[in-house]
Amino acid sequence: MTAPKPSKTHIGNHALHPETLMLNYGYDPQLSEGAVKPPVFLTSTFVFRTAEDGQDFFDFVSGRREPPEGTGAGLVYSRFNHPNSEIVEDRLSIYEKAEACILFS
């Protein structure tokens, strides 16, 4: 899982409940053509700028190397990570008040 995305946790002095936070947590519309709700990504593979970037991302996701400070591993292959899975993981971690969450089958 990548680091959870920052999200509003209060409105004024009122703390939002986990059920409310889950509605939008972990999703940035600016990264998906401005879609209000997360699209369903029907893909298993993702594009890299260069072959070297692809190799780096596979190394980061598989744990062979640590990604640079402040960056995530990036999207590589859906068996490792996937935009929809990351959103669900982020939202479940909020709901369960956990540091992180992982999906598997």
Which stretches of residues belong to each language-model region?
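N-terminal glycine-rich, Lys/His-bearing helix-loop that initiates the first secondary-structure elements
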Residues: 1-69
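Conserved N-terminal alpha-helix of the aminotransferase class I/II PLP-enzyme fold
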Residues: 45, 50-105
